[in-house]
């Protein structure tokens, strides 16, 4: 990459990690972003332009698109028209010799990626192996690949979109599931699905692809569930696991076996000491007979459905936020089985009301605080108040984590919960 002229579109956390990496490889880096402050906060750009730039920089060798930048962006379209290779940070990492020093695993899917990545790292470390989580999990891959150990990479559909360069580096990979998600970005489920399946272009061998649910081609890691379930269901000392969690852990088990032979006993021991990340069907406690569950990570209809299946009945569910192109009517079958009342909040509350008001009692709330207050006024002993929004958080919050923390604080404003 030495002496190459490279455009980096996006100067957020990922874009800055890309700029630093390219600078270290001797590239001439041109940064483009909608924020001048973001551009100026990165010292690795040789030139800086706002994304309203009218003249496309000349003689460019490479174009790096930050994951959040849509392929329809005018500068991306122009780069494609000029025949300039377009990559993401993940593709850059996969092409770099430093990444190849250790085995690597890639994990993608609509839901469960972070839990699976973190458990796989935990499992490998419990067996004495160095392993590191990186990628879409919040740790830029171009920074984390400096670590000495197995690379476990969470990869989003954004990072796999328009995978123009095949980089067969992964020792194993999993597509956990595919359901409607980010349709505001990908425009169709087919485009979204194709982006996820691009992970196969990164595999050393397609025989090392593991898939869940009805997906094909690939080996099904769900084959492990029978063996593992038989152990878990025999009075195991392990805490109860939701069905979707079992699926995620089985995926990690299958992928770990692509690296090394992992005894079932080692897997079960790792389960005993693993702490699931927050905001994922997280039980907060009970007060006055009402239970509270934080599932702020649920930003798709499929994730909401999994939460409702896990909780089962007497649910007051808080839905809403910023819709990502999902169809709320797809929830009607599971809602009518498990939910007694819907509280629709935020930017798309009217849209939710139009889609669901005929199926169940529904109340609208302007924001999360009002939604929690309304849910509490409706709840009776034995009920569950479940925050499982099925939407992005950006109408009220900077992230799903901030939304979940706010829910926890609102719940914590009451007397101490009994956990």
Swiss-Prot record:
Which SUPFAM superfamilies does the record match to this protein? MurCD N-terminal domain, MurD-like peptide ligases, catalytic domain, MurD-like peptide ligases, peptide-binding domain
Matching Gene3D superfamilies: Mur ligase, C-terminal domain, Mur-like, catalytic domain, NAD(P)-binding Rossmann-like Domain
* Annotated pathway: Cell wall biogenesis; peptidoglycan biosynthesis
The question of whether DNA repair is a record keyword is answered with: no
Alphabetical UniProt keywords: ATP-binding, Cell cycle, Cell division, Cell shape, Cell wall biogenesis/degradation, Cytoplasm, Ligase, Nucleotide-binding, Peptidoglycan synthesis
- According to its UniProt record, this protein's enzyme class is ligase
- Annotated compartments: Cytoplasm
Chief subcellular location equals: cytoplasm
Reactions catalysed: UDP-N-acetyl-alpha-D-muramoyl-L-alanine + D-glutamate + ATP = UDP-N-acetyl-alpha-D-muramoyl-L-alanyl-D-glutamate + ADP + phosphate + H(+)
Chain sites annotated for binding ATP:
109-115
Spell out the InterPro entries in the cross-references: Mur-like_cat_sf, Mur_ligase_C, Mur_ligase_C_dom_sf, Mur_ligase_cen, MurD
Q: Which GO terms describe its cellular component?
A: cytoplasm
Among Pfam families, the record links this protein to: Mur_ligase_C, Mur_ligase_M, MurD-like_N
A single Gene Ontology molecular function, please?
A: ATP binding
Please tell me whether the keyword Cell wall biogenesis/degradation is annotated for this protein: yes
* EC identifiers of the protein: 6.3.2.9
Q: Name one GO biological process term.
A: cell division
Q: Which HAMAP family match?
A: MurD
| Record-linked PANTHER family | UDP-N-ACETYLMURAMOYLALANINE--D-GLUTAMATE LIGASE
The job of this chain, per UniProt, is described as: Cell wall formation. Catalyzes the addition of glutamate to the nucleotide precursor UDP-N-acetylmuramoyl-L-alanine (UMA).
Q: Which family does it belong to?
A: Belongs to the MurCDEF family.
Q: Which NCBIfam families match?
A: murD (TIGR01087)
Q: What is this protein called?
A: UDP-N-acetylmuramoylalanine--D-glutamate ligase
Q: According to the entry, what is the taxonomic lineage of the organism?
A: Bacteria, Pseudomonadati, Chlamydiota, Chlamydiia, Chlamydiales
